[in-house]
Amino acid sequence: MKHRIGRVEGEILRELTKILQKNIRDPRLSEVTITAVECMNDLSYATVYYSLLTEDANKEKEVQEGLEKAKGMMRHLLGQTLTVYKVPELIFKRDNSVKYGSKIDRLIAEVKKQDAERASK
């Protein structure tokens, strides 16, 4: 059963990415990248994780509103391509791992710069 859920999650991820690029014309969603999908065991709900390159709180709120508005159309288009009895209800959550990764990169670069300054003294 877990293998099937994993396949469905992968299929939802691929299809939602295509739908966002081709069918959704909301300018608020132009910078959104879908990073992961997790489904409940009965496939009734799918949590869709997305990332943004910006850290602006207003932009983040606009994107969340845009995703909520486009949720019905996304689910409808998913239903046309998925081979499951019932299309899962979509729940959108911000994926902070990308933001965390960029913060770590900045810290590493800062430490390297400090090491280089110490070595030159």
Swiss-Prot record:
Monomer. Binds 30S ribosomal subunits, but not 50S ribosomal subunits or 70S ribosomes. InterPro entries: KH_dom-like_a/b, RbfA, RbfA_dom_sf, Ribosome-bd_factorA_CS. It is found in: Cytoplasm. HAMAP family: RbfA. One of its GO terms (biological process) is maturation of SSU-rRNA. It comes from the Bacteria. GO terms for cellular component: cytosol. Keywords: Cytoplasm, Ribosome biogenesis. Signal peptide: none annotated. One of several proteins that assist in the late maturation steps of the functional core of the 30S ribosomal subunit. Associates with free 30S ribosomal subunits (but not with 30S subunits that are part of 70S ribosomes or polysomes). Required for efficient processing of 16S rRNA. May interact with the 5'-terminal helix region of 16S rRNA. The keyword Cytoplasm applies. Belongs to the RbfA family. GO terms for molecular function: ribosomal small subunit binding. NCBIfam families: PRK13818.1 (NF010391), rbfA (TIGR00082). This is Ribosome-binding factor A.
